[in-house]
């Protein structure tokens, strides 16, 4: 590992329609092969679908969904004397957000509906309602941490 100074975190510019940094981060993760305009149109169409189906502000549903998917704990492998333990550790806020966004996009892509905008809208609405695959992933992560609570003293 290089012993140089810490790399500064690049600022995220807010998106054009909602003026939100969260939406901008989501668009960047959703983007494939540098096609940002395609990613933007997918997310904005998903927001239109959410507005149509729920009648709520799509940004509120989006933020609620992210809050419901963000994990608080995760397990990290730690090798102690020949055996590997799954040690539960708390997650810092930036990683919580990154994991939540990654999980939501991943599970939206694997949904059965037709069209990414419909898939993403469905996953966002499910996550906002405390159901869906991404919320289950968070629950599974927390269960793993709870099951390995005995190894918490191996934290570093």
UniProtKB/Swiss-Prot annotation:
GO terms under cellular component: small ribosomal subunit
Keywords: Ribonucleoprotein, Ribosomal protein, RNA-binding, rRNA-binding, tRNA-binding
GO molecular function annotations of the record: rRNA binding; structural constituent of ribosome; tRNA binding
SUPFAM superfamilies for the chain: Ribosomal protein S7 (SSF47973)
Biological role: One of the primary rRNA binding proteins, it binds directly to 16S rRNA where it nucleates assembly of the head domain of the 30S subunit. Is located at the subunit interface close to the decoding center, probably blocks exit of the E-site tRNA.
Entries under NCBIfam families matching the protein: rpsG_bact
Similarity remark: Belongs to the universal ribosomal protein uS7 family.
UniProt-recorded name of the protein: Small ribosomal subunit protein uS7
């Amino acid at each position: 590992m290089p012993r140089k100074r810490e790399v500064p975190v690049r600022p995220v510019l807010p998106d054009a329609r909602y003026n939100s940094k969260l939406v901008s981060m989501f668009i960047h993760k959703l983007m494939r092969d540098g096609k940002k305009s395609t990613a933007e149109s997918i997310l904005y169409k998903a927001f239109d679908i959410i507005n149509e189906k729920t009648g709520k502000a799509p940004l509120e549903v989006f933020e609620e969904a992210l809050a419901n998917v963000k994990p608080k704990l995760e397990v990290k492998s730690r090798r102690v004397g020949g055996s590997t333990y799954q040690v539960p550790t708390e997650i810092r806020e930036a990683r919580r957000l990154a994991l939540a966004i990654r999980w939501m996009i991943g599970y939206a892509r694997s949904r059965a509906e037709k069209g990414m905008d419909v898939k993403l809208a469905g996953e966002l609405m499910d996550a906002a309602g405390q159901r869906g695959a991404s919320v289950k992933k968070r629950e599974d992560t927390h269960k793993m941490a709870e099951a390995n609570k005995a190894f918490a003293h191996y934290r570093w």
